Amino acid sequence: MDKIILIDGNSLSYRAFYAMPALKNKKGLYTNSVYGFTLMLEKILADTNPKYALVAFDKGKQTFRHQSYEAYKGTRDKTPSELVEQFGYVRELLDSYGIKYEEHFDYEADDIIGSYAKIAEKEGLEVIIVTGDKDLTQLASENIAIYYTKRGVTDIDYYTPEFIAEKYGLTPEQIVDMKGLMGDKSDNIPGIAGVGEKTAIKLLTEYKTVENVLDNIDNISGKKLKERLTEGREDALLSKKLATIYTEVPVDNKLEDLTYSENIELKRELFEKLEFVSFLRKLSQETPSEEAGEVAEENASPKKEINIVLADKNTKIDFTDSTFHVECYTEDYHNSDVVGIVVYKEGTAYIFSEEQFFTNEFVVDYLQSEITKTVYDFKKILFIAKRNGVDINGEVFDVKILSYLIDVNAKTEIDKIIFNYLGKIISSDEEIYGKGAKRTLPAQEVINPYIAEIAESISLIKPLMEEKLSEENMVDLYKDIEIKVAKVLANMEFEGIHVSKKALEEMSEEFDERIKTLEASIYALAGSEFNIASPKQLGVVLFEDLGLPPIKKTKTGYSTAVEVLEQLQHSHEIIPLIMEYRTITKLNSTYAKGLVKDITREGKIHTRYEQTLAQTGRLSSVNPNLQNIPTRIEEGKKIRKAFVPASDDRVILSIDYSQIELRVLAHIAQDAGMIDAFKHDVDIHTKTASDVNGVSLDEVTSSMRREAKAVNFGIVYGISDFGLSNNLGITRKRAKEFIDKYLETFKGVDKYMTDIVDFAKEHGYVETLFNRRRALPDINAKNKIVANLNARIAMNSPIQGTAADIIKIAMVNVFEYLEKTNVDAKLLLQVHDELIFDVNKDIEEEFTKEMIKIMEEAANLDVQLKAEASSGASWYDAK
């Protein structure tokens, strides 16, 4: 039987756009939707080998359905401009395949597809409909199957009458009845309020159609349901009508016109223009030609099956020009099993268990040699090597870190990197292992080819990244800072920090008592007991029982968000108690109780650092997050009392940079006033208040200094008069006057802010003093809100990013000193601008001086960096 494929062009374009990474060609044209559409088309044509094909598109926003219901599809968001610009290229793609496309005023793509499907079915063809929209499933029949793209563009459910019966217990014809009862949010079809899918299916199982359900309301049990059906009668009938596909559109083509034949040259031209390297490579293999195009020639290489060898501790490998990959069951490699380690070289993948890998003398020699290691996620690999008693030497080429440096906006999961650089889709972590409670370890027959393909892909990506890194002048940033920081972090993670379980439990007992006291006080003021943690119940108490003025409403009731409570804190004495209750319960659950589960048998907590997450270059801490322990309130600070040295003859030493971002700003902006203040060690906030208010340093009041401090720290974040007035509780007029006077006083800062935004608009990025680049693709956006946000990022990123680079350089230099001298001290934690050490008391004074020197010499600025130290019997005592 001959086949015809009918493709929902709009649906698939949207699905591809949101499923694919935000790909662009070198000219800045978004290409992700076209790429995903091409993937889908290639797969469908290869899988089905149809004789006929057609793609249907929507034409215009209004259809005959709007005459019945003006709000039809009225809740849909505006199509993103990044997708709109690709629609024309999707049509060019279809031209290159020789596939016709069709659109009609007054009808939707679904109607066109439905009309052709019925014509083709009558002619005895097998009909395959490809869509990301379940509306078309109503057309399923013995000869019509719907290929529904449920996730991405190549993950498909096959809707046949049998599948629909199994999934819903309904026939395809009843799909419109189901939508008549339950509605369809995506199309703004109302349905009957309060009737969901389960109820609709139950009713249709018994009564078959919407009309029959409505005719039998008296026989249906449930008072509330009867009321809903009675009140929603007209909506149900209208909704069914809206959901029903019209199958008599006056179509443009006869079936015999829908045969297709690809045009290789058109394909090649389009793929070269859009820079679809993998498709060009495939094209060059299928149609070898001297004029295969530069991109195809450069990247063409015949696809070979990877030879998989199960290796053990005796396997000998020549590691020159190899890549290796360590695959863990979960991303938490501190506690995860290694499911396989693969070494890839020249088409062969050697797969080891963790034990066999690290007991293989050839492997250990390789790891400790100066041979370059090409990997994904060096920090993880080094941590796992250390737990096996092995260190890693030599240069390291880490595609995860490099992907992050080259495009800080790109995702760094290995499947995303492979797609971005090779245009190749491999299974995602979720597809291999599952998600959440359904996560399971598949058989080695699944794992081995998967990790082999990853290792092979890493080897192919390496030369592409090397070229890009050099182009963007970030070789030194990678070699001198980032890859060395990865080694420091792996060692810090492996070392961990001692935490007193007893101290945490004592704090938790104190918090429990305080929570009980707060609850009693809150209940007394409220006049009744209620769940304080429930926003809904709290909203009723505050805004109905106590009569406080509502500030904001949500879908479920009154908003009791922190910003709402802050506005109300002087309105009633219950508000400060509720705010304190929230603070104490959070400290108790997250830290006093929460951290206990993270303490290992050795009495330590091993946080994990994210090196490729923050767009500014800063490090973050997870599992647990030790950077977010609150320090503005005493109860939060006390959590740090539990973080202690390894023994009584040691101390916790904290050294942090003083006002590093302002010092960086003074240097980059070359502001004479700021530079002078720092050079003469004048308090920068007092100096700012003095200059802006036109008073002497001695005349600066605490409120003046507070205003100056807020502007100093907020100015390069693009703080507005509105933001400053909220922060300080002053009028917008006063805030504007202060900002204007500030910029008039610090002309270098004002000039920097203007110049850096102009640079970003011209070049599309900004960078730090150490060439860390942050792309700003939307700096010239027509949307003023988006453009202004990017302008603020442009002002801030060089400052915050340079500060991040400096602390990283300091970490590298500190770690190298520790390794070189073998001094009795350990680097334990990094928290923003602060380094935490465990130090023997006997060497504390000398060691502290050396660390301050190293940190203050990490960068050569026109303003001297300043590091300040403190120590004590715990992290709390060291501050």
For the regions a language model picked out, list residue spans one by one:
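Conserved "right-hand" nucleotidyltransferase catalytic core of DNA-directed polymerases
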Residues: 232-354, 417, 437-634, 647-651, ...
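Function-dense linear segments that define catalytic or interfacial modules
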Residues: 343-347, 406-411, 415-435, 450-452, ...
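C-terminal polymerase-core module
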Residues: 513-520, 524-576, 744-792, 796-798, ...
